[in-house]
Regions:
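Conserved C-terminal "lid"/linker of ANL adenylate-forming enzymes
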Residues: 99, 125-130, 135, 151, ...
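Conserved ATP-binding loop and adjacent catalytic segment of the adenylate-forming AMP-binding
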Residues: 1-42, 49-53, 62-70
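Adenylate-forming
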Residues: 50, 84-115, 148-166, 186-187, ...
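A structural signal for short hydrophobic beta-strand segments in well-ordered beta-sheet cores
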Residues: 32-34, 75-79, 129
Length: 239
């Protein structure tokens, strides 16, 4: 695991038996501090490979470091084995993406996102989790078009045609039902979902320079889609 601010890396996994999400242990010379934030442990770094600050942006720099000089990453980590720290750390989502429902319940976006992508088997290319200050969790699904075409039995169709096809919508409902069966409460239950009928824009900040989606910007840029998820009268695009 690494970021621009910890060039070239912060943690490294070198032991056999690696798996998705395994980050390993801090590189030599780097201090890792785990700070409780929003019910998780935020990774904070201090060392010679950590940048000193943002160029000519003193206010942003001040916010990026804590009182002990550790860089605050916004990444949540957890131990592979709490009794043996040498086994390394596991990525536990982005704290900056997490939010509270209007009940005060924390929603951990990274966990829900990974679960829905896994359950989607190609239909769900990615997903934006919604629900900040709302009663329930919603999802804006970025569709895997090849999977949509296969399910719908169509080739060369437009995005709008594919995501509105009954067979594709039915498959999304099955995914929601499967996840609901594993839910432990409002913090893990996705009640409504809608396919994104728009193409993600790099220019509008919806895709990061690393190729991942920017949840916050997608929600900000498409308020009409979020509004449909929480409307009293549900339209036909909502699953």
């Amino acid at each position: 695991l690494g970021c621009t601010e910890t060039c070239p890396s912060a943690l490294f996994a070198s032991e056999p038996g690696g798996f998705a999400g395994l980050l390993g242990v801090p590189v030599p010379g780097l201090e890792l501090k785990l700070t409780p934030v929003a019910g998780k442990l935020e990774a904070r770094y201090r060392g010679k490979n950590v940048f000193p600050g943002y160029w000519r942006q003193p206010e942003l720099t001040a916010r990026a470091f804590d009182e002990e000089g550790f860089y605050c990453t916004g990444d949540a980590l957890r131990f592979v084995d709490v009794t043996n720290p040498n086994k390394g750390m596991i990525f536990d989502g982005r704290i900056a993406e997490d939010f509270k429902l209007n009940t005060g319940t924390w929603v951990h976006v990274g966990l829900l996102r990974s679960q829905m992508i896994a359950a989607g088997h190609g239909l769900v290319q990615d997903v934006v989790i919604t629900g900040h200050d709302n009663e329930f969790i919603g999802a804006i699904v970025i569709p895997g078009l090849d999977s949509c075409r296969k399910i719908a039995g169509l080739s060369g169709s437009t995005l709008e045609v594919l995501v509105s096809h009954p067979a594709v919508r039915h498959e999304l409902q099955k995914i929601l039902n499967e996840l609901a069966g594993k839910s432990t409460g409002s913090a893990t239950l996705i009640e409504r979902a809608v396919f994104a009928d728009f193409t993600l824009s790099l220019d509008r900040g919806e895709i990061t320079d690393k190729g991942s989606i920017n949840q916050k910007m997608i929600i900000q840029n498409h308020p009409e889609v979020v509004a449909r998820l929480y409307a009293t009268e549900i339209d036909e695009s909502i699953v």
